[in-house]
């Protein structure tokens, strides 16, 4: 650090005399270049994550875990602005910067405007034109048997989980920094089967295939793409059945090697780890975070 300030002092004029035939402006330009390099060394560029559905449940946990690892966060919400603003306050109390933006991932026509909002937010809050991490987390759950699932329910799940992830990522990709990371949320239900989740699991299976294709095609930009597949988690997802129904909770725990149902922090911590500097060589993978359910 002393080197940085020593070099900066010479720019202020103490040692800025030019040799015969040399330009003082040229000397200052060279010195400024050195200082910029030192500044980048001591103060690396802050990394920014966008987390869809970050106002509650798993997305909230991801936001807080990433902030705990020194990341800044842009989180999205659909209708729960109060909850989203509360997460922003929590992150700011941790010494990090956060912004909440409204986004309906089922409304694909809104993605262009959302992309512009992200661009303006990056410029106004971070003086940047790109971000580092995208976590496609937003989603809903619909419990219905194969025979009872309606076309409307099927389309709703597809528009949010599969089509939304596909086209939102496509729209935001020009803003993702080269060497960045993308995490798509899948589900343990894409591996094991439980009655009532045929349509939901089909979308998550699609996410896992999409993840591999994205990893292949975005490799030229050194962008890694992975899928995180949670098991059953105690949240308000799907009406909070796993959290609030003791019979369901006990059954899932009995089918899990570690003997309990998952918690939001189990997933938030896993996603934060996948976005850490130590995980840059993981690419195109499905990472199940379920405590070993249905082994």
Language-model features and meaning:
Residues 55-56:
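Conserved glycine-rich cofactor-binding loop
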Residues 71-86:
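Conserved glycine-rich Rossmann-like NAD(P)H-binding loop of the short-chain dehydrogenase/reductase
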Residues 131, 145-146, 150-158, 252:
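Substrate-binding pocket helix/loop in short-chain dehydrogenase/reductase
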Residues 169, 203, 211:
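Active-site helix of classical SDR
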Residues 187:
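Residue(s) in the substrate-gating loop at a strand-loop-helix junction
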Residues 192, 272, 283-295:
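Short C-terminal tail/terminal secondary-structure segment
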Residues 219, 224, 282-284:
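Short, small/polar-rich loop/turn modules that mediate ligand/substrate recognition or access, typified
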